[in-house]
Amino acid sequence: MAAATVNPLMSTLKSDSSLQVALHPLPILEISDYITRSYLRGYKGAIVGALIGQQNGRQITIEHSFSVKTEHTGQNYKVDSEWFTARLDQMKAVHKDRALDFVGWYTLVPKSGPTDAHLPIHSYFYSQNESAVLLGFHIHEILNPVAGDPLPLTIYESNLEIVDGTEASTVEVEGEDREMKDVTAEPSRSIKFRELPYTTETGEAEMIALEFVREGGSANVTTTATNITATEDEGSDKPLMKKVVDTNKGSKRRAVSSDDAAAEAPTTSSAAKGTATDKNRDANLTKAELDYMSALQAKYNAVQMMKKRLDTVISYLQRLPPDYLSSGDASSQQQQQQQQQQQTEGLDQPQYTVPSNKILRQIQALVTNVQLVMSNSTSGQGQGQGERDTDLGALEKELLKETNDVKLVELIADLMSSVKDMKEVGKKFHVVETAKNSKRREQASHGGGERFNPHHPYPGGGGGSSMMREHAGLVGEGSASGSGGSGPAGDLARFDH
């Protein structure tokens, strides 16, 4: 029997590094999204990315990741060093509050472990960080998932181990001649990988993101809703699938069942098949519309699940023995009559469910609490139109009151903002006026302050003393007839004289 194939890059020694790796869910989402987008776009290159986190001694946390640009050189790929350095600096700047740094890289790895194609890239990352780990995604486990299996990934550490050439032989024959080696020669070393155990940690922000993914975001819109619509058949619970097909008769289309479409498929000509194109009707929808469709789909699924649960409860109650039903109930009397009729006719008695008091109490509590979760307008069947209108009016008043409260809060916020702006304007006005007053006081203290203005009626621009102005006026009045001049110019001339 042939020996099992052993990966030569996997170390046979146990790990003595005692590394403890904590994996966060956000890198897993980013890596899976990158793989999905690459597959849908038909990407033919290498799927390689970097892992950033914290490394405290022997403890490593993997918190974020980003894709890495690679170049194809012959048979292998290599990392664009300049691009990687620039992108790593950007990621460090974004997460500088957490002091995140490069701790490893990820790629697609077979279940048996890394291959020779991974060594050039790992050697580059090993030069950046000797403790860099390799997160290998197993694509085959992603394509063929099995319930209960762990995450389709493995984390490896790398070490330089001495290779003496005997590891290539997996079976050692007793008594076989072996080559003598020079013990003084320096032994060769090669990179070997070892599997590392890891734990998962989740932060508060990551829990919010996972909750959004679990509930179904805008990217979770079902693809079957674009061309296929499901309608419930009245006679059975199986949905009838209908598909919009082109009948090649003008521009009209009609909805036919899947069986009819399969029957009509052979009659379609090859030319029509070549020219027919399936257009996605959701291609031009906005994000808000996609979110609305996703919310409607989630509500539809919830209603369907509730309907199935109610059908199960009704079926359970219908299969209870007649003695567990009230004697005054019409349905119980009808069941007793049917049972007596079957006994007289010799027919087989129906199989009743084993009653459970716990289940019956839960059903009773559910029926009792129905009135608490339903509105008054839908709780009773005998309400008149006036009462329903009253309930609707009360609801509209409540909505109007809440709307007014919200708008009032907004107006108060705007008013407070305006008051704050007015206070700032008042402070600036006070500073300007204070500066002007101080300047005027300085000019007055220097005896006029301004230069001589020939167009001003008094020298000094009105900044001089009152006695000088009175003297100038007296001189002007006493010599008005002798000077032959009048007005401000004459006054100035007489004052100069």
Swiss-Prot record:
Pfam families: JAB. Residues 230-282, 324-350, 435-497 are annotated as: Disordered. GO terms for cellular component: COP9 signalosome; cytoplasm. Residues 236-246, 440-453 have a biased composition (Basic and acidic residues). Residues 21-162 form the MPN domain. Gene3D superfamilies: Cytidine Deaminase, domain 2. GO terms for molecular function: metallopeptidase activity. It is found in: Cytoplasm; Nucleus. Residues 475-488 have a biased composition (Gly residues). Keywords: Cytoplasm, Nucleus, Signalosome. The keyword Endoplasmic reticulum does not apply. Residues 258-272, 333-343 have a biased composition (Low complexity). GO terms for biological process: protein deneddylation. Belongs to the peptidase M67A family. CSN6 subfamily. Component of the COP9 signalosome (CSN) complex. Component of the COP9 signalosome (CSN) complex that acts as an regulator of the ubiquitin (Ubl) conjugation pathway by mediating the deneddylation of the cullin subunit of SCF-type E3 ubiquitin-protein ligase complexes. The CSN complex is involved in the regulation of the circadian clock through its control of the stability of the SCF(FWD1) complex. This is COP9 signalosome complex subunit 6. It comes from Neurospora crassa (strain ATCC 24698 / 74-OR23-1A / CBS 708.71 / DSM 1257 / FGSC 987).
